[in-house]
From Swiss-Prot:
Protein name, entry field: Uncharacterized protein ORF208
Organism: Acidianus filamentous virus 2 (isolate Italy/Pozzuoli)
Superkingdom, natural source: Viruses
């Protein structure tokens, strides 16, 4: 199994890498934010240019296709500012989405989001997933890539792992000013898959 991250936004990558030690780190040279001279010290990175400047969904879709096409193994994909304690956890045998803290900017609520691109995909499902994501790029699909992958590609389970955290900005796009939101064992562990937004307590948690 390979643990892969990509970015994007690398403000908090170093903290998470020093715990997870990702097997593969994909760096999109078209989208570098929060990188310092020490960010990638002793990290074996792979450069991949999406050549997309103004469409985040297309950029992410291209990167996911690259990951799923080149990692010939079961794969976990995590955002560079997301930590899920998967190294010491048993994983399901089927495609799985890790629910993460997120912001619903529409109603300005912090939520537990279960349509993210933070996923576990067994090798058996990689080729079908690539085919479906390529359809996303070819078509004029008016939805975020995370929603499309979650709902319209292959069947995903959705789980909440206590200890998961995500750095969330206080205003849209301000990834240099964030707070760490952590899912603890006191949060919702059983989710209603019919509804993918889940309220969280409006406070900072401490990873236990």
């Amino acid at each position: 199994m390979k643990v892969v991250t990509f970015g994007g936004h690398f403000h908090h990558f170093r903290e998470i890498y020093d715990v997870l030690h990702h097997d593969v780190v994909i760096v999109d040279d078209n989208h570098l934010d929060g990188v310092t001279e020490n960010t990638f010290d002793n990290v074996n990175i792979t450069h991949y240019k999406t050549n997309v400047d103004d469409n985040k969904n297309v950029s992410i879709a291209k990167t996911l296709i690259y990951i799923y096409s080149t990692v010939n193994d079961d794969v976990i994909v995590l955002d560079s500012d997301v930590y899920v304690p998967i190294r010491d956890k048993p994983l399901p045998n089927s495609p799985t989405i890790f629910c993460i803290p997120a912001v619903n900017w529409g109603n300005k609520k912090y939520v537990l989001y279960c349509d993210s691109t933070n996923v576990f995909v067994p090798r058996l499902y990689l080729n079908p997933l690539v085919d479906m994501l390529e359809l996303y790029l070819k078509g004029d699909i008016d939805m975020p890539i995370d929603t499309y992958q979650s709902r319209y590609t292959i069947a995903f389970n959705k789980i909440v792992v206590p200890g998961t955290f995500h750095y969330l900005p206080s205003s849209p796009g301000d990834y240099a000013n964030t707070k760490k939101w952590v899912v603890t064992s006191d949060d919702i562990l059983s989710v209603n898959i019919a509804n993918t937004w889940y309220s969280m307590l409006p406070c900072d948690y401490v990873l236990k």
